[in-house]
Amino acid sequence: MHSFASLLRYGLAAGATLASASPIEARDSCTFTTAAAAKAGKAKCSTITLDSIKVPAGTTLDLTGLTSGTKVIFEGTTTFDYEDWAGPLISMSGKDITVTGASGHLINCDGSRWWDGKGTSGKKKPKFFYAHGLDSSSITGLNIKNTPLMAFSVESDDITLTDITINNADGDSLGGHNTDAFDVGNSVGVNIIKPWVHNQDDCLAINSGENIWFTGGTCIGGHGLSIGSVGDRSNNVVKNVTIEHSTVSNSENAVRIKTISGATGSVSEITYSNIVMSGISDYGVVIQQDYEDGKPTGKPTNGVTITDVKLESVTGTVDSKATDIYLLCGSGSCSDWTWDDVKVTGGKKSSACKNLPSVASC
């Protein structure tokens, strides 16, 4: 397996003003103060500054189809009026796009207006940010507060997200649920570097994709660093994933791989390295092949293979009522695993593990 880290190394309408000293610069640099102006004028700008935009209810801040090479800067406080709808609040696509946050900026979703403790099962709530078709691009230094539901939906090739802060801490007491930070699918080449997340669902969830690198993460609350659920999608392959140098605290799980019962697919070339956990309420390490309708059944199947899984220096503590390690594999579907310095303590030992490779233990 190749380390992905090593691969990485080798306006125009009302509400818009144009900053310039010449006609050419006037077309190139745009500042927008409304979502409508940004949508109308985006194609004519090589640099877009979004200054304290208040996005109308039920409206997406639409930055899809950006001209190649466009730079996007969030400035001031971006807010969103309330409506029960599926979103997204922001959508962006294009090639070679650079997205940054200006000093002191904030993207405040004010998610408590939607939170009801039910997540996707309650009233309609908008997802935050679609990075779909945002290829060969980067998102750096965004400060995000209180997303109504999932934060980033990533379906892009060769995209890097660095120094992203997602602070949904208020959701712990106000009913935040299904507030995943980074959901990755149908992507080749995703780098997530030094994120800081406090949420109420997965810090990272990879449903499909290849060449994915997550490093330097701080994950508080939520459900940990997850692969899956894999299966029953148009793409059921997860390959060459490195998740490293990250902490998971006060979460349900720390390290998790889950696959759908009766489905087919593959999870391969997976590395969890230098993961430190604390305050885990359910499972320190959990790999299971029995999910159906979003819940475990206790009956694993072997249609989705889990191979070449490496856990190294995965350490820490779980709560006394939690389970240190739980491994539930189908017959012959978990193989070629490597475990080194996996030390999870503080909880119960599982007697229900099944079909685990000889190098692993519960």
UniProtKB/Swiss-Prot annotation:
Pfam families named among the record's database cross-references: Glyco_hydro_28
Residues forming the catalytic site: D201, H223
Induction: Expression depends of ambient pH (higher at high pHs and lower at low pHs), probably under the regulation of the pacC transcription factor.
Protein name stated in the entry: Endopolygalacturonase II
SMART domains noted in UniProt: PbH1 (SM00710)
Keyword Kinase belongs to the record: no
Record bears the keyword Signal: yes
Propeptide: 21-27
Temperature-activity note from the record: Optimum temperature is 40 degrees Celsius.
PbH1 repeats: 156-186, 209-229, 238-259, 267-289, 301-322
Keywords attached to this entry: Cell wall biogenesis/degradation, Disulfide bond, Glycoprotein, Glycosidase, Hydrolase, Repeat, Secreted, Signal, Zymogen
InterPro entries from the UniProt entry: Glyco_hydro_28, Glycosyl_hydrlase_28, PbH1, Pectin_lyas_fold, Pectin_lyase_fold/virulence
Catalytic activity: (1,4-alpha-D-galacturonosyl)n+m + H2O = (1,4-alpha-D-galacturonosyl)n + (1,4-alpha-D-galacturonosyl)m
EC category: hydrolase
Family designation: Belongs to the glycosyl hydrolase 28 family.
Record PANTHER family: ENDOPOLYGALACTURONASE B (PTHR31884:SF13), POLYGALACTURONASE (PTHR31884)
Signal sequence interval, chain numbering: 1-20
Glycosylation sites: N240
